[in-house]
Amino acid sequence: MNKDMCVACDDGILNIRVGAIIMKDGKILMVGNDRDYLYSVGGRVKFGETAEEAVVREVFEETGVQMEIDRLGFVHENYFYGDAPSNRNKLIYEISLIFYMKVPDAFAPVSESFMEGSSKEHLVWVSLDEDIPMYPQFFKTELKNPTNMIKHFTTDERSPSAPRSAGRQRPSR
């Protein structure tokens, strides 16, 4: 079995991740656990997988539903400090490719919860206007008016003076 594209480096951890944008009735499907924030459906790319294969696999693992990709929406470079027991306070540089998914009309997750390693996670439908912390944070603004552009965002939480989020875009191909 191929391993997750997660590499321990001298100064931190490098993650290659995919995320899925699953929108229905003006809400987005997000994942939560015992922390006080939500994050996108998705996970790490496995060595030997393409990002497209990884996002389809992750969506199926987390929802039990096979979905097709609509298009690549975002490239997100993210520097942050880990908060899980395995990476607590370690600097993580994560590169995420985030895809809009084609959501079937009758879509409903097979289960509202699933196990990720040893932690239990749950799926939540959230309005972008709800006052709930979610990551990536740019979802709250960018998903209200989606475009056919591939947008690139960089989030840097290494220090209070570091730029929090910056973005640029280019046409989707």
Residues covered by each model-derived region:
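Active-site-adjacent beta-strand/loop module that shapes the phosphate/pyrophosphate-binding cleft
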Residues: 80-110
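Conserved hydrophobic "DFG−1" position in protein kinase catalytic cores
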Residues: 22-23, 30, 101, 125
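Conserved Nudix-box catalytic region and its N-terminal flanking loop in Nudix hydrolases
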Residues: 24-62
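Acidic, metal-coordinating catalytic segment for phosphate/diphosphate chemistry
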Residues: 1-19, 25, 89
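A generic structural micro-feature
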Residues: 12-14, 87-95, 115-120
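NUDIX/MutT-family hydrolases
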Residues: 100, 110-146
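Charged phosphate-binding loop/patch that engages nucleotide di/tri-phosphates or the phosphate backbone
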Residues: 134-173
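A short coil-to-beta-strand element that immediately follows conserved catalytic motifs
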Residues: 66-75
